[in-house]
């Protein structure tokens, strides 16, 4: 049944012709929501612009929901939209990163210019304004309907 399949190319079998035409109008070849979603964050939970002069915690109660064969990543970009140079050459955190889950299965990522003293997983941000892009390929249906990315809390 092509309405539930998630294989590569299945988007062309779906019946959402109007939606697919609108996507093609803006960016031919762009992924539809069934294939990928791209949440972006520019502000913390206090509605302040993200700035590497501060330290933040990105807390996932549960890992981003993707289907088998899918993956997720979070990448930090400077306000110039380029990757941020850093001493450990780490530019993103993904489902394939070597992070350590909390006892309850949640994940905490420290966003800051300097390595955290508590040993938590660190995504370097530089010491200027930055933003985050999350990519979820083959997101689980609940991601499309109910899941909200976590807020970013200043420490």
Which residues does each PLM region occupy?
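Single conserved hydrophobic/aromatic residue that forms the stacking wall/gate
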Residues: 1-12
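Extended, compositionally biased non-globular segments
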Residues: 10-133, 137
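Exposed low-complexity, polar/acidic, P/S/T/G-rich flexible segments that act as propeptides
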Residues: 139-155
